[in-house]
Amino acid sequence: MTKKKVKVGTNTIALNKRARHDYFIEDEMEAGLELQGWEVKSMRAGKANISDSYIIFKQGEAYLFGATIQPLNVASTHIVCDPTRTRKLLLKQKELASLFGKANRDGYTIVALSLYWKGAWAKLKIGLAKGKKQHDKREDIKEREWKVTKDRIMKNARLG
């Protein structure tokens, strides 16, 4: 019996760290992406950015808007490579209906959280989010600073 090969490295292509700072993430979901060949090659080279991207709905379908995938220099010359084109998300009808309803009725925003490989497929983790106010962001910063201070105090108490 042959052993499975252990993969070295990470499966993450791009992260949207700003999303967790600007929004309360209520729910997360995984979606596939409809990509062109040059986009897959660029993503394998790590040329993707989803920091300012979000999900829009058009004609009952969900699309990733604002994501940038820079084409490689060796990309095909007979295809026009648009780095900021809107890309269709591959979701089940039930998931689409749920997201659409919450975004329209309840005032949620749907943001892209991370882009990663799952096997040979590129997947996008999307989050159902509510916007944070300025005071919420300040509270998060205070909590983070208090945690660091508390850990420092506990470490000094253990050592001395």
From Swiss-Prot:
UniProt keyword annotation of Cytoplasm present: yes
GO cellular component: cytosol
Protein's job: Required for rescue of stalled ribosomes mediated by trans-translation. Binds to transfer-messenger RNA (tmRNA), required for stable association of tmRNA with ribosomes. tmRNA and SmpB together mimic tRNA shape, replacing the anticodon stem-loop with SmpB. tmRNA is encoded by the ssrA gene; the 2 termini fold to resemble tRNA(Ala) and it encodes a 'tag peptide', a short internal open reading frame. During trans-translation Ala-aminoacylated tmRNA acts like a tRNA, entering the A-site of stalled ribosomes, displacing the stalled mRNA.
Transmembrane segments: none
Family under the similarity heading: Belongs to the SmpB family.
Subcellular localization, as worded in the UniProt entry: Cytoplasm
Name of the protein in its database record: SsrA-binding protein
InterPro entries: SmpB (IPR023620), SsrA-bd_prot (IPR000037), SsrA-bd_prot_CS (IPR020081)
Major site of localization recorded for this protein: cytoplasm
Gene3D superfamilies cross-referenced by the UniProt entry: 2.40.280.10
UniProt keywords, alphabetically: Cytoplasm, RNA-binding
GO biological process: trans-translation
GO molecular function: RNA binding
Lineage, top ranks: Bacteria, Pseudomonadati, Pseudomonadota, Gammaproteobacteria, Pasteurellales
